[in-house]
């Protein structure tokens, strides 16, 4: 326990409370360890709503109900040093409440007055000192399988070892995650992938049986051998891709050099469900090869293939996100990333490209050009088998850099407006609007990028040539 622990300072914001109350949970645990306290959990023998109102008035904080069914209230803002959640004592009193908690290090209590000793009924102080995660009771995880994810997350966050009995209980309880509410599972998984070292946290989750319970398709990928261009099985490769995504996120200049700030800004942009684009890309990295087990084949030559794993994987990712009840925005981002993760690699041997050809790729992966390039690079870096040569990796990364340069250049030119809009082109060519018109507008955009269309006359001339090349009537 940290020598700097100050019980009175921790509980000072709770002075307006009138009924007996205690600080419990992760906030107390972190304070005892000398870690920053992001939130305080308070249990009270009084009326949580009335107590929340008293704190709100004293600190100018906002309050709102977390759960009317359980009588829990949350306070934020004002001059509160951190978020405060207030809820009633569960069961027959403090001891009963603490016995219902998950881990001994979370089953500690401190009187809200800041006076007296930390109440420890389950050896939590000892386990804090010994830096280990121990269950309060043998059925703690079975009663709520989502706690398996919490076990991995908190152990990783604190750098604690997981007690052997807790690990065994986690493996036994993990199958129950599939029957748990998707929203709760996704909330815990989001905390894992946004950890300081998400690859380490995910591997710890896997070690106690939780990863396959959350994403069964990844469990299917365990031990699935790949071609000689790979040095890892599919699951190992997937986790290494996640590592590379995080590494690029932290130091984009290592790959993208002068465009590091462009990458950093895009990955740091909020996307959905409390995740930034970069954090959502971590989830996409976990999903990108999830269909490889289902699509593995071996040719007569012995070559291992995974034909269509991008398309099938996109369908699997879509179904998974629906099970987890993610937002449509996050689901669409992940699905696009999985479906298109091979697109850049297919272009490596077709270089060099014109600006218009770069534009075709960028439009294909829109609105996620930066994230698509980061995932493509991470995927390439995690593919380093005996048949992979340094020049293959060099060419792939060079194309990614060139594509990022093109993205920056084209973005600076936007909006690229055609000299003639669709209605004007249809009228000039005396043709009814249809799919051909969208294709013509795309072709016109590419001609603009090449500098061959720049005004109405050049647009008219190009449109007539294009229609004629398609076997149509170019108009009068």
Stretches found by the model and what they are:
Residues 1-476:
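Catalytic cores of the polymerase beta-like nucleotidyltransferase superfamily
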């Amino acid at each position: 326990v940290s020598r700097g622990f100050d019980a009175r300072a921790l509980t000072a914001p709770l002075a307006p409370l009138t009924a007996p109350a205690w600080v419990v949970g992760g906030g107390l645990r972190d304070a005892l360890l000398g870690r920053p306290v992001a939130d305080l959990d308070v249990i009270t023998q009084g009326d949580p709503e009335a107590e929340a109102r008293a704190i709100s008035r004293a600190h100018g904080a906002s309050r709102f109900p977390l759960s009317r069914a359980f009588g829990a209230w949350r306070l934020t803002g004002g001059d509160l040093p951190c978020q405060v959640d207030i809820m009633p004592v569960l069961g027959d009193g403090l001891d009963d409440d603490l016995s219902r908690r998950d881990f001994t290090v979370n089953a500690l209590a401190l009187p809200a007055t800041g006076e007296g000793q930390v109440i420890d009924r389950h050896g939590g102080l000892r386990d804090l000192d010994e830096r280990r995660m121990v269950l309060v009771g043998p059925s703690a995880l079975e009663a709520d399988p989502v706690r398996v994810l919490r076990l991995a997350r908190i152990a990783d966050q604190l750098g604690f070892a997981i007690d052997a009995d807790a690990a065994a209980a986690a493996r036994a309880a993990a199958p129950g995650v599939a029957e748990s509410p998707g929203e709760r599972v996704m909330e815990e998984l989001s905390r894992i992938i946004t950890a300081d070292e998400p690859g380490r946290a995910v591997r710890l989750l896997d070690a106690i049986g939780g990863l396959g319970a959350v994403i069964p398709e990844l469990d299917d990928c365990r031990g699935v051998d790949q071609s000689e261009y790979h040095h890892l099985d599919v699951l190992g490769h997937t986790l290494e891709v996640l590592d590379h995504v995080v590494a690029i996120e932290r130091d984009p200049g290592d790959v993208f050099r002068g465009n590091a700030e462009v990458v950093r800004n895009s990955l740091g942009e909020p996307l959905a469900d409390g995740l930034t684009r970069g954090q959502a890309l971590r989830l996409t990295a976990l999903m990108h090869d999830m269909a490889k087990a289902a699509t593995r084949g071996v040719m007569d030559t012995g070559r291992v293939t995974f034909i269509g794993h991008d398309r099938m994987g996109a369908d699997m990712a879509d179904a998974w996100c629906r099970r987890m009840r993610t937002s449509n925005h996050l689901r669409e981002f992940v699905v696009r990333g999985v479906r298109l993760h091979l697109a850049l690699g297919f272009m490596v041997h077709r270089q060099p490209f014109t600006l218009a050809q770069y534009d075709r790729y960028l439009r294909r992966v829109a609105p996620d050009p930066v994230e698509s390039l980061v995932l493509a690079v991470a995927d390439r870096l995690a593919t380093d088998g005996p048949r992979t040569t340094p020049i293959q990796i060099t060419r792939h990364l060079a194309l990614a850099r060139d594509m990022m340069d093109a993205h920056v250049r084209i973005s600076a030119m936007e909006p690229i407006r055609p000299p003639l809009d669709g209605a004007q082109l249809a009228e000039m060519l005396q043709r009814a609007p249809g799919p051909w018109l969208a294709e013509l507008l795309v072709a016109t955009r590419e001609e603009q990028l090449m500098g061959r269309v720049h005004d109405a006359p050049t647009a008219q001339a190009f449109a007539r040539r294009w229609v004629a090349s398609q076997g149509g009537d170019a108009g009068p």
